[in-house]
Amino acid sequence: GVLLDLDTGTYPYVSSGMSGAGGAATQGGIGPRRLDKVLGVFKAYSTRVGNGPFPTEFDDGSQSALCQFIRDTGREYGVTTGRPRRCGYLDLVALRYACLANSIDSLVLTHLDVYDTLDSFEACVAYKVRGQLVEHFPASVRDLEDAEPVLRTFRGWKRSLKEVREYDELPREARDYVSFIEEYT
């Protein structure tokens, strides 16, 4: 994740390396002239490893069952440690920031099928920071820590996406979600 990147992440809650697009050239052994397209890969929901601000994180109360469902269905556990990842609704404000910070050419959406059985779900379209509406990613970690998500609700599709191979085969509700993400970012 971009928010763990040493340069563009939510310092001090970052890793010691570059996990953004620039890391492919500086740490991946790929010459910068060999990069002609930048793909941004993201999940239909948000996750975070370790500490740090996470405005859309599911709470331990009313959302604990939803968190556990997404964690189990999406297999959101650390590969080496087995620790459960922090999960929450897709943060479109953070995704738009990631696109800008990394000059993303195209997005690749994964884990859409995790939502197959839900009646509805939400995505963050802005924040409220100390009572003020904020539609951009905050420059300060303190503002991000104080951010409350402004959520938009989407209808679920209640059908398996397992056999879907083409965009047009997606249920209308899934296409609506994808279209909203495309327009927002």
Report residues per predicted region.
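Non-transmembrane, aqueous-exposed alpha-helical and coiled segments at domain scale
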Residues: G1-T185
